[in-house]
Amino acid sequence: MTAIIDIIGREILDSRGNPTVEVDVHLEDGSFGRAAVPSGASTGAHEAVELRDGGTRYLGKGVERAVDAVNGEIFEAIGGLDAENQIQIDKTMIELDGTSNKSRLGANAILGVSLAIAKAAAEAAGLPLYRYVGGPNAHLLPVPMMNIINGGAHADNPIDFQEFMIMPVGAETLKDAVRMGSEVFHTLKKQLAAEGHNTNVGDEGGFAPGLASAPAALDFIMKSIEKAGYKPGEDMYVALDCASTEFFKDGKYVLEGEGRTLEPGAMAEYLAELAGKYPIISIEDGMAEDDWDGWKALTDLIGNKCQLVGDDLFVTNSARLRDGIKMGVANSILVKVNQIGSLSETLDAVETAHKARYTAVMSHRSGETEDSTIADLAVATNCGQIKTGSLARSDRLAKYNQLIRIEEQLGLQAAYAGRSILRG
């Protein structure tokens, strides 16, 4: 009854107006699943390949080749299979692709099918996606990392680091956490406007003011947290995404906005200095994706008291994560479904992290859609943290709103991760 009888791929647009893949899956019993695939702006060199068409159509960014793969080869290979056999289906698609990075069929094609099948199977089972994937113990609502100031590749301003986020650790519930974040977000907007800064929002809904440095951005955030009625380092903490690979040149970190160039050791010390001065509890991609020595230095310096998240470093890849675990590098993995390209491999990466006592942070991409799958996956995996943008733009709010619904559905079973994520 849960056999796959039809798969329909199509080209839709993401939050940046670029094409992406959407997939519908129909099962024999009438159950249906739909998934849309996200896309990143700053991408790691080791990510699975997002297949684009090239040529002039959509300035080369069309995804008709990936859609053709969904409607053709992939459907031929998995049509008739039982949607409940997620691992077998994902394995079949990966083997059909035949490359190490999904470059033939495209990770965007494979992922769209993988997620849509999980949704259809959940509907067939009469379960919400988080319960279908996570089982009876899926009840932990994640602390949001809310991106309120943008720099780097996500903004046209001098700030070198890509994201400055607030984490409402002191909230009692996820719903309260969203409210607290919204209050700080709107307070920050007023503060920026009062001092003559631009308050337009970027790809992920955060502001992109013309501030000169990371400390300048952090100072603004501290003032906004306090003015909104909260205590930095108690109610609200801060997280950074440095996206350091973007400014790692010839073995050095070139901070153009701050007008200085740092050796890896000095970069690690600079981040440690910021973490000592401000209530920073998480730093993502503090060092470049292949600067393993720099990562080791940073981990040795502050890994016992600060979450050090590997995004470009690990690219949701269990093999790279295992290398990092062996080397004692970082202590957390950012989980982006399209970096690895299937649901099964995503869940494997989270499990690998948890077994090694590394944390996992479920994450969006800068190019998103109204699809809210990652909200369900954050709860399904009990990862306790989610990174899904600011308190603006419906493509970001779709995830927060879904988490609010999930918390309501769980009722007394629901638990907000809150202070449990703090280290040291």
Curated annotation (Swiss-Prot):
* A single BP term in Gene Ontology: glycolytic process
| SMART domains named in the record | Enolase_C (SM01192), Enolase_N (SM01193)
Annotated catalytic residues: E204, K336
- What keywords is this UniProt entry annotated with? Cytoplasm, Glycolysis, Lyase, Magnesium, Metal-binding, Secreted
Q: Assign the protein's first listed, main location to one coarse class.
A: cytoplasm
Record's function text: Catalyzes the reversible conversion of 2-phosphoglycerate (2-PG) into phosphoenolpyruvate (PEP). It is essential for the degradation of carbohydrates via glycolysis.
Q: What is this protein called?
A: Enolase
- State the species of origin: Sinorhizobium fredii (strain NBRC 101917 / NGR234)
Lineage here is:
Bacteria, Pseudomonadati, Pseudomonadota, Alphaproteobacteria, Hyphomicrobiales
Q: Which gene encodes it?
A: eno
